[in-house]
């Protein structure tokens, strides 16, 4: 199952899928899935920082509001701190409420952050499972998933029949499915 489109569509689709659907999305987009995750992270980070800047600029413009500070402000430190908090949230799925304080649609950002964190965790597990396959199985699967080669092409290179490669791929997928589904199901519990 290929997912083409914007990250919001991918995030929404991934979040709403069951374990089987999530596995299908990861396998169908295996070669580009890390890029999908990185792009989604960058967009979320950009949107949150833009919202924060909007809130800061509007709070300064309000008349009648006097904010007294110590006079020491370090915008570079503040931005670095915000970046670290957002990056940590995207990796762990745990959101410091301070980074979303006052932001409109904070709940949407929370869901997106948790989804991206789950996507990363799920994909890292899938990569580990694929790496742990026998060398030959891993090679054949990567030719299909990463290089986009057809079963016929793989069969020709391996000196085997199309049917033999097809059956082997079915066996490999079943092995991956068996290993990963329990974990994906646990991750789906809080993902909807």
Q: Where are the model-predicted features located?
A:
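A short pre-motif secondary-structure segment
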Residues: 140-141
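Short, locally clustered residues in the helix-turn-helix/winged-helix DNA-binding domain
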Residues: 131, 145-146
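Alpha-helical hinge/cap motifs
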Residues: 133-134, 159
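C-terminal flanking helix
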Residues: 173-184
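Helix-turn-helix DNA-binding module
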Residues: 147-164
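N-terminal interaction/assembly modules
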Residues: 1-129, 182-191
